[in-house]
Swiss-Prot record:
Cellular compartments annotated: Virion
A GO cellular component annotation in the UniProt record: viral capsid
Main location per the UniProt record: virion
InterPro entries given in the database record: Seadorna_VP8
DNA repair found in the keyword field: no
Assigned keywords, A-Z: Capsid protein, Virion
Function field: Self assembles to form an icosahedral capsid with a T=13 symmetry, which consists of 230 trimers, with channels at each of its five-fold vertices.
Highest taxon of the lineage: Viruses
Claim: GTP-binding is one of the keywords in the record: no
Official protein name in the record: Intermediate capsid protein VP8
Amino acid sequence: MANRATSAFLDNPHPVGVNYVDEGSRQFVAVAELLASKLIASSRESDESNSDVPFVQAYSKFADDNPRHLRVKTGGKMANALTNVIRSYYSINAPAIVPQVEIDRLASKATVSGDMYNSYAVFNSVPIVEVLSPAQTTVSIVGSDRADVTMLNTGAGAANITFNFGQIAETVILKGSVPFQLARANQPMPAARFTYKLRPLDGPFIVVLPVGNPLVISATAATRIQVPLAFNKALVESGFQTAMNDGLFDAQNVNYYSSFDEFIIAQYHALDGINRVSTCVVLGLALQAYDQMRRALPVRRV
């Protein structure tokens, strides 16, 4: 095999920090999310009842501020701690670390389990793609939300291209620019078709590459990751976009990801011996809290 190509998107992820992953910090994030969810629910209740009482009570609990300061509505000590915790994970401009005593004090404002692994979510992004091809073929791989594999065969006859997808994703879907043939190694080759759904991924897989026109295969993957039961992917994604817009992830010379799915999958492949996925799960719940807080308190905070 003369040529080897891998997905550049996964080759050099900027690793998320490993701050705030202890039990007390996980408890703080879970409490922040719980109180933020009550804050936004109380805001709607106040609108519907034309009474400030529900919001005042929820805000006082969330913000840890005396009610006489409610007219400011910036979120108080909880908002400051939550914002700084999120900022610290991925930014070279992170503020001072939130003191552990403050984390513990705010975490005691409600009783939650802090269990970050009692449910799961499925994340969709680019899979590991490793392609081995013989001489007189070329292969390139680009993309972040999907991997576009472009192959060209300039030889005298059809070539077998070997694909491997690793063992992290559970399912990979391949879509061709034209119908193509694919089978597991040492298995009969089926008739050509546009789409293949691969599961399990214990390859390798062989693609038949005809001579002539380029073949483009787009690969997307679904990866199941354990998350807390309260984890809401829509709110996490909204919080991720809001935090990006607010500058909480500002950093120089690093990858910027278009979605939280891309972000967590890239961290999944930062194979440096540190479990950064568990950190991303805590960060995701913190972003969910941030999203609800910002919608309940629509003022620019950073």
